[in-house]
Amino acid sequence: MRVLLQRVKQASVEIDGNVNGEIGQGLLLLVGFTENDGDKEIEYLARKVLNARIFSDADDKMNLSLQQVSGSILSISQFTLYAQTRKGNRPSFTRAQNPDIASKNYDKFNEKLRESGVQVETGIFGADMQVSLVNDGPVTIMYDTDEE
């Protein structure tokens, strides 16, 4: 499982010209699953995201978590995080999890985040989405359960 985290001042997702989710200060998460991902990976990365100390404290040091700054999450499903690009010029996505399973895992991941009390907005799994954001920092971090 991979989560590309971006610290944002604001972010939104549109589907068919309609805003489906939007947040102010918080985290934009691009979330992808590979074949054997399940509950263990979901628990691990939800905990890592929620506890990441990447917001500035009074001394301008990255020392505060999302919950400590009352931030929100915009979570976007992103199977292209598992693109294979070594051969040829067109990426292959064969390492991405089957969409039926990945959709359920995406829902479980978002629910696990919500259990902490954090506001979680989402796109729609498999939809064509337009994501807008104001990156804060920028701070961009890749989490990968294969690199625990």
From Swiss-Prot:
GO terms for molecular function: D-tyrosyl-tRNA(Tyr) deacylase activity; Gly-tRNA(Ala) deacylase activity; Ser(Gly)-tRNA(Ala) hydrolase activity; tRNA binding. It catalyses: glycyl-tRNA(Ala) + H2O = tRNA(Ala) + glycine + H(+); a D-aminoacyl-tRNA + H2O = a tRNA + a D-alpha-amino acid + H(+). Its main location: cytoplasm. Keywords: Cytoplasm, Hydrolase, RNA-binding, tRNA-binding. GO terms for biological process: D-amino acid catabolic process. Disulfide bonds: none annotated. One of its GO terms (cellular component) is cytoplasm. It comes from the Bacteria. InterPro entries: Daa-tRNA_deacyls_DTD, DTD-like_sf. Its EC number is 3.1.1.96. It is found in: Cytoplasm. Gene3D superfamilies: D-tyrosyl-tRNA(Tyr) deacylase (3.50.80.10). A motif (Gly-cisPro motif, important for rejection of L-amino acids) lies at residues 137-138. Belongs to the DTD family. NCBIfam families: D-aminoacyl-tRNA deacylase. Homodimer. A Gly-cisPro motif from one monomer fits into the active site of the other monomer to allow specific chiral rejection of L-amino acids. HAMAP family: Deacylase_Dtd. An aminoacyl-tRNA editing enzyme that deacylates mischarged D-aminoacyl-tRNAs. Also deacylates mischarged glycyl-tRNA(Ala), protecting cells against glycine mischarging by AlaRS. Acts via tRNA-based rather than protein-based catalysis; rejects L-amino acids rather than detecting D-amino acids in the active site. By recycling D-aminoacyl-tRNA to D-amino acids and free tRNA molecules, this enzyme counteracts the toxicity associated with the formation of D-aminoacyl-tRNA entities in vivo and helps enforce protein L-homochirality. This is D-aminoacyl-tRNA deacylase. It comes from Ligilactobacillus salivarius (strain UCC118) (Lactobacillus salivarius). The gene is dtd.
